[in-house]
Amino acid sequence: MAHKKGQGASRNGRDSESKRLGMKVGAGQRVSTGSILVRQRGTKWHPSQNVGRGRDDTLFALVDGIVVTKKTDRTYISVLPE
């Protein structure tokens, strides 16, 4: 056992708080207007029909309905009204 901490040991031990990004609702789930569908940095998922995009690229539902994802060259998320 070392009787001294060693160089740099006192400078370690930090980590950033997780930002809880990602899909908040899965495909096929029912959502209400204003529900957050995805939290993201940049546009990993793109808004399609009845989906809005916030300043921080958050996707949210513009109508009540069911979430649908579609993957082509990009992944699109839409909400089909009920």
Swiss-Prot record:
- Quote the gene name from the UniProt entry: rpmA
Species, as recorded? Chlamydia caviae (strain ATCC VR-813 / DSM 19441 / 03DC25 / GPIC) (Chlamydophila caviae)
Keyword annotations from UniProtKB, A to Z: Ribonucleoprotein, Ribosomal protein
Where is the stretch described as Disordered?
1-54
Q: Which residues form a coiled coil?
A: none
Sorted alphabetically, the Gene Ontology BP terms of this entry are:
translation
Spell out the protein name for this chain. Large ribosomal subunit protein bL27
Q: Which GO terms describe its molecular function?
A: structural constituent of ribosome
| Pfam assignment, any one | Ribosomal_L27
